[in-house]
Amino acid sequence: MEKFTKIQGIAAPMPLVNIDTDMIIPKVFLKSIQRTGFGKNLFDEMRYNRDGTEIPDFVLNKPQYRDAEILVAGDNFGCGSSREHAPWAIADFGIKCIISTSFADIFFNNSFKNGILPIVLPQEQVDILMKDAEKGANARMTVDLEAQEITTSDGEVIPFEVDAFKKHCLLNGLDDIGLTMEKAAAIDTFEAQAAQARPWV
């Protein structure tokens, strides 16, 4: 998993509330357990017409937001089913941080495991960031995980909270497999000792 330290990028505004995982990645595309390849179908039903052409008014289809790395979203983002394909699609598109007033618990935790930083802020601060994001590609927002600060294009600094363990994992690029590999030497030692103590196993 790629390390997350600091990003400075375009933020896309998506004020719609209750964006569920089926809206993020419709179930028709859940045909693979590979983490890549889902970005093209992110927000598919909002992003494309039935004939496959783009819907010009959808925020991520607008030229100024096609390379967005930050999403400023409405309340209760990621609700619905627990499919891990939702953060896979978001990460594959290139979005590394989502800011909202609240997230569904399973989506929230799955995001960290897939290199995405979900940030919870009060409504008034989300409103400030939403307004900043509406400025388009000329307004670049900075998210500094180590300092736990968001800086708007105007220089306003907004602090945020993040669980210390989840922060450690993102800063060091550790998913569940990476965390296990950190303990590889201890695991090998335990297995060797267990084999000596119980050779019949």
Swiss-Prot record:
Keywords: Amino-acid biosynthesis, Branched-chain amino acid biosynthesis, Leucine biosynthesis, Lyase. CDD domains: IPMI_Swivel (cd01577). GO terms for cellular component: 3-isopropylmalate dehydratase complex. It holds the Pfam family Aconitase_C. GO terms for molecular function: 3-isopropylmalate dehydratase activity. It comes from the Bacteria. Its EC number is 4.2.1.33. Pathway: Amino-acid biosynthesis; L-leucine biosynthesis; L-leucine from 3-methyl-2-oxobutanoate: step 2/4. It catalyses: (2R,3S)-3-isopropylmalate = (2S)-2-isopropylmalate. GO terms for biological process: L-leucine biosynthetic process. Signal peptide: none annotated. Catalyzes the isomerization between 2-isopropylmalate and 3-isopropylmalate, via the formation of 2-isopropylmaleate. Belongs to the LeuD family. LeuD type 1 subfamily. This is 3-isopropylmalate dehydratase small subunit. It comes from Ruegeria pomeroyi (strain ATCC 700808 / DSM 15171 / DSS-3). The lineage of its organism: Bacteria, Pseudomonadati, Pseudomonadota, Alphaproteobacteria, Rhodobacterales. The gene is leuD.
